[in-house]
Amino acid sequence: MAVILKNDSLRVPEEQPEKPRAVLVSILTDADTAEDVDESMDELARLLDTAGGTVAARMVQSRSAPDARTLIGSGKVRELADMCRNLEASLVVFDCDLTPVQIRNMEDDIGIEDLRVIDRSMLILDIFALHAVTAEGKLQVELAQLQYTAPRLTGRGTDMSRLGGGIGTRGPGESKLESDRRHMKRRVDALKAELAVVEKNRRTMRQSRDRSGLPRIAIVGYTNAGKSTLLNTLTGAGILAEDKLFATLDPTTRKFTLPGGESVLLTDTVGFIRKLPHHLISAFRSTLEEAVYADIILLLLDVSDPHCEEQLRVTEELLTELGAGAKPTLYVFNKCDREAGDRAGLERMVSDRFRDSDARRALCISARTGEGCDALATALETLIRQGKRRVTFRIPNAQSGALARLYSEKAAVESVEYGDEYITAVATVDDRVYGLLKQFDPNRRTPEGE
């Protein structure tokens, strides 16, 4: 009788599926600089890695203007086809948006079976589909993907079925992509209706937070700047923090106590990126608007990234587009533990960068190690208290509407005590609210003649 030896060490490990190999393509026009194109291509490579692919090669075509048929011209397409065959690449990713006709023309001209041509927006949508966890996130991704994909089905018919799974095809699924336009429109309408309900619930939650009177701070910044890590370090939130682009799609809010004892609400938000598709901004508007409703913006930057200045520009532009560009802002340079060189020099650089604006404050931290986080908390406290005062109001019971006014004006009410004749409320208010209720401050100094 045969003897079967059980030995775990003899087990053959399961083969990991091979990552799809991709050629990255961009064009350098008269309106671009070589440095900008290189930076954008570096970012595209990171996006591909996050999506589960690997870079086989890069191609940059210098042209005075894009070619209408193939973007890069017929000669360069032939060169691209040879490159894909030699490198066994199954994917071509363009660092710009392509028209449906350009995608079809290039796939036909390259002539490699099962090779896909996608653009930067399709890749970003794919990553969002990969990382969507909550019901809201999945609905937002599907809506954005359908809105972007629907016009790109033009003339392809059932050819879409040959794509199979993989990068650029995640999300709604093949059955939806092969549906006719009327079916897709019905699905888009249904998604918008579902999201309207979700957004209503989000507004209710936001109003509930408003009634608490606690200052709201939105942590915003470029994707992978360390926003989730910072929220975890400050509050122990325990949310996913990965070294990947767009690891966080759903905002998370946690209470945080400042050194002086005052509580605030910290919200982690979706990361920004250059060339963020506008249909994606539209689909995720309710999520991105957490920054709009914040009292203070904590703008986090990865100081170890060589493209930090460009990322700051992109983040500020998107904040302005969302209507949050004028908010009081604390600029926080993260990952200082990775920065080689003189730390004092780095601090001076940060201070010099923002010395011309009182509304801008900046400091360096490491969210990973906690270095500088105490100073960050103190800076937030200082920013919050600007123009505010802590007052003990003494309100006659007959004028209890003044207490309701405190809440409606979103004052930070610490305590309320009801007496036989008076209501005693301790609250932190700004100058405007204090002016409305100053008659209930027993310690107020009354100017002569008032």
Model-found features: residue ranges?
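C-terminal-of-GTPase-core extension/linker across diverse P-loop GTPases
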Residues: 1-24, 45, 151-225, 231-232, ...
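N-terminal accessory targeting/assembly segments
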Residues: 1-120, 124, 445-450
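Switch I (effector-binding) loop of TRAFAC-class P-loop GTPase G-domains
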Residues: 5-10, 200-202, 209-215, 233-265, ...
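Conserved C-terminal guanine-recognition region of P-loop GTPase G domains, centered on the G4
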Residues: 10-11, 33-50, 77-86, 95-115, ...
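Conserved nucleotide-binding/hydrolysis micro-motifs of P-loop NTPases
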Residues: 28-32, 63-65, 97-100, 122-125, ...
